[in-house]
């Protein structure tokens, strides 16, 4: 074996991730390098993170997620404001991207809804909604959505029971399931 890069291939260095200051759109807003070059995310040096949770580890910056969620929620409310002749607009976090009860709480607290695609995602979102909105959230899921192919009658029934605000039915069969679920 050789460590040589084949002719015509880019050098491996070109595959390195750009620095936070060069491409801030690819990094959390809190990402920076220390004077000695260490990467810091959310106020924690990567070496500190790895000391607590060995690699591989997934790091989600709460301040960054909250800031982006608040920006999206505000933009949708402002740009689709009913006084502009629009019907209103809402921003929804895609639960399929990464969903825990805590992540769901953060985006709900910042004014977003949550788009779910399974009974599990819906259950996590309902639990988070109850933490954020209190006991009335057990029957008021208007800040949530449920879509996804092949929904079961049980999933649709849960959504209807909790008054999920956006139920996307993908077929006439799902319309029949919804009718039977009520």
Set out the residue ranges of the language-model regions.
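A charged N-terminal "starter" segment
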Residues: 1-182
């Amino acid at each position: 074996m050789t460590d040589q890069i084949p002719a015509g291939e880019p050098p491996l260095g070109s595959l390195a991730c750009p620095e936070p200051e060069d491409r801030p759109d690819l990094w959390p807003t809190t990402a920076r390098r220390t004077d000695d070059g260490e990467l810091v995310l959310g106020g924690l040096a990567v070496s500190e993170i790895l000391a607590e949770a060995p690699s591989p580890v997934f790091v989600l910056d709460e301040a960054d997620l909250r800031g982006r969620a608040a920006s999206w929620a505000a933009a949708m409310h402002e740009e689709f404001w009913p006084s502009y002749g629009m019907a209103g607009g809402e921003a929804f976090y895609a639960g399929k991207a990464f969903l825990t009860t805590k992540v769901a709480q953060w985006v709900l607290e910042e004014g977003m809804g949550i788009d779910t695609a399974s009974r599990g995602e819906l259950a996590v979102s309902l639990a988070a909604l109850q933490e954020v909105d209190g006991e009335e959230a057990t029957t008021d899921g208007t800040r949530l959505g449920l879509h996804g192919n092949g929904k079961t009658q049980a999933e649709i029934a849960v959504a209807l029971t909790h008054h999920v605000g956006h139920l996307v039915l993908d077929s006439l069969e799902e319309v029949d399931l919804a009718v039977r679920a009520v």
